[in-house]
Amino acid sequence: MTVASQIKGAVHTAVRHDSAGNHVSGRSVFIDDMPELAGTLHAVLVKSPHAHAMIKSIHTTSATSLGGVHAVLTAADIPGTNDVAPIFENEPVLAVDEVQYVGHPVAVVMAETMDIARQAAEQVAVDYEPLAAI
């Protein structure tokens, strides 16, 4: 007798998925299917292209001058603690002075539409001093 044949429960057994029927029938409602609430803003992160670098400056003027952009925030704009780590308090919401991985968020753009937010995020100019990857 093999180990697999001795296993009881969900292994080798069909398990009903609660939302499967709605998914395959097209009845599922996803967030993009719902009407937007009045005043909704869309956020897009500006992320580091570097694995490790010092942030020398962040220029947001071009982004904030686009129509429909409500704000471009950096770590300097966060009141209180800039951290989302659940335990050790070492994960900033937005990078401060240094990025430590490709994709490390350095700014967030908030605009009236996702398209405007994406366009504005591309206009944020971050001056980096690349460092050796950690």
PLM segments and residue spans:
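Flexible, low-hydrophobicity surface segments
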Residues: 1-134
